Amino acid sequence: GDDVGPTKAIDEADLDDTNYYQLLGLEKSGIGVDADLVKRAYHKALLLYHPDKGSAKYETDAVFLAVQKGYDILKDKTKRRAYDSTNEFDDTIPKGNEGDQPNFDFYATYGPVFRANARFAEKMPVPELGDANSEEKDVENFYAYWVRFESWRDFDLETQSKEVHEEMDRYEKRHMKKENAKLAAKRKREEMERIILLVERARANDPRLKIFAEQLKAAKLEKRRSRENLRQA
């Protein structure tokens, strides 16, 4: 189909500002794209960038190699996840003190942040934050899911700052790999702490939880009153 694949060639000078999804014309599909779609986009990119067919106007070789590399990464689920983990992502979460502001909108503040982080969810489907009319069980399910959130975000690529070179001896190589793995594990821990903090801040500011707590308190009080009335009767 004509719905995927690059429509216009990218100049070599713009390669640094182009991610593999853009290069292969898959930016609309985004992460989670299936292998068949990647293959179709790659074939279209080959027609556009193949050095034999490329016009002299473009320095196609560097771009062509980038297309090859992009295809190699995006068609493979494990490699793609590692790439998606390093691809620009906004790690910021609400500060947690927004409730002090007069025009604070809990759903507009926290909803998009949970939705954005859901891209890394191992377990599907991911429950939505909902709104003021959400039922108590749905709100409980939402928080139960996020407290146990399993992220597939992978920091192996990001932490490979220490390159493992072929000319290194095996002890050096082993040491470098160990250091990189240690760094990746540290980033993963920080990532989980970030998600837990997001959940804690959301819970502290969720107006529905306050309402549910008040309703529970009122129900208990009512129960106690009716017991006392029975005793007095």
Model regions and ranges:
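N-terminal J-domain/J-like co-chaperone modules of DnaJ/Hsp40 proteins
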Residues: 1-54
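J-domain helical core
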Residues: 32-49, 59-87
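Intrinsic disorder
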Residues: 14, 29-36, 58-61, 74-77, ...
